[in-house]
A protein has these predicted regions:
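Conserved G1/Walker A P-loop phosphate-binding module
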Residues: 1-75, 79-81
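Conserved glycine(s) of the Walker
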Residues: 16, 155, 246
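Active-site phosphate-binding and catalytic loops of NTP-dependent enzymes
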Residues: 30, 99, 171-175, 198-209
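Catalytic P-loop NTPase motifs of RecA-like helicase/translocase cores
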Residues: 39, 62-64, 96-97, 124-125, ...
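Conserved C-terminal guanine-recognition region of P-loop GTPase G domains, centered on the G4
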Residues: 51, 75-143, 216-218
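Active-site glycine-centered loops adjacent to acidic/histidine catalytic or metal-binding residues
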Residues: 58, 119, 149
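Canonical P-loop GTPase G-domain recognition
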Residues: 113, 122-180, 184
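P-loop NTP-binding site
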Residues: 184-293
Length: 293
């Protein structure tokens, strides 16, 4: 009998959801950094086995939105509660469970299996972990609690076995050679944005959006033109840097990552433009693909 189903990953920012997603899928589907709000979209990663197809979805961290971009991010996370066969709620050993009570209340009312994953247990001792398990059990009494360390792959194989046990009998939903629902251009923009998150400080990375204007692939190489949008002229200056040094350095690292991702030579051309207050504009958010509908 073949099993198939949708397994959605939710939780607060910076608890390791994207790292877990990549470990489960076995491929680098979601960008992952130490900064909160790295994931902005809902991203699908598909695991295909002879007797099963597991469709994972990584989602943005749950937060109280301050502007329209964050409202869209929260909508992506809440949509993951509607169409899952199994829900993975990711927390860690230091998180305050009470900070998203509204979202937790929705999780508590779900009738599907909920696996509560306490991540980063490599950063904890037994007493702290025991206290954390007890606290979460009182908050989500119907959830099955599994301690893991996504970064070190501890508990990931056991988690995969448990997920397969919980999936319904079903034919596959996607072709067996399909890995994700996102096109190549999406991963280009995400990899560039990941390097911006790593190379720039403070508010700059959160004010940036990347759009691929041109993607031309041959057997030997890929030629990419990408625009980095910011909200202010001052941010444009910071991204470019003195004599263009900062932009060149970031773009070089992005090109190397893209070559590793695609397995061929990449010619990357980056440009910086100002799109004033794009994070608060519904029209611009729709243009950048932040419509959760």
């Amino acid at each position: 009998m073949h099993k198939a189903g949708f397994v959605n990953i939710v939780g607060n920012p910076n608890v390791g959801k994207s790292t877990l997603m990549n470990q489960l899928v076995g491929e680098r589907i979601s960008i992952a950094t130490s900064k909160a709000q790295t994931t902005r979209h809902r991203i699908m990663g598909i695991v295909n086995e002879e007797d099963a197809q597991i469709v994972f979805s990584d989602t943005p961290g749950v937060l109280k939105p301050n502007y329209k971009l964050q409202e869209s991010m929260l909508a992506f996370s809440e949509s993951a509660l509607q169409d899952a066969d199994v829900l993975l709620y990711v927390t860690d050993v230091v998180e305050n469970p009470e900070k998203n009570e509204d979202f937790l209340d929705k999780v508590k009312k779900m009738t599907i299996p909920v696996l509560l994953l306490i991540n980063k247990i490599d950063q904890s001792d037994q007493k702290t972990l025991g206290d954390t398990v007890e606290r979460w059990h009182s908050l989500l009494p119907n959830a099955e609690i599994l301690p893991i360390s996504a970064k070190n792959k501890f508990g990931v194989d056991m988690l995969m076995r448990r997920i397969k046990e919980l999936l319904p009998d079903s034919p596959p939903f996607f072709d067996k050679d399909q890995l994700t629902d996102k096109p190549a251009r999406f991963f280009v923009s995400e990899i560039i944005r990941e390097k911006i998150l790593l190379y720039y400080d403070k508010e700059i990375p959160y004010s940036v959006e990347v759009k691929v204007e041109s993607f031309k692939e041959t057997d030997r190489n890929i030629d990419i033109h990408a625009v980095i949008y910011v909200e202010r002229d001052s941010q444009k200056g910071i991204i470019i840097g003195h004599q263009g040094v900062a932009l060149k350095k970031m773009s070089t690292e992005a090109r190397k990552a893209l070559e590793k991702f695609f397995g061929k030579s990449v010619y990357l051309h980056t440009f910086v433009k100002v799109d004033k207050d794009w994070r608060s504009s519904k029209r611009e958010l729709d243009n950048f693909g932040y419509n959760p509908e």
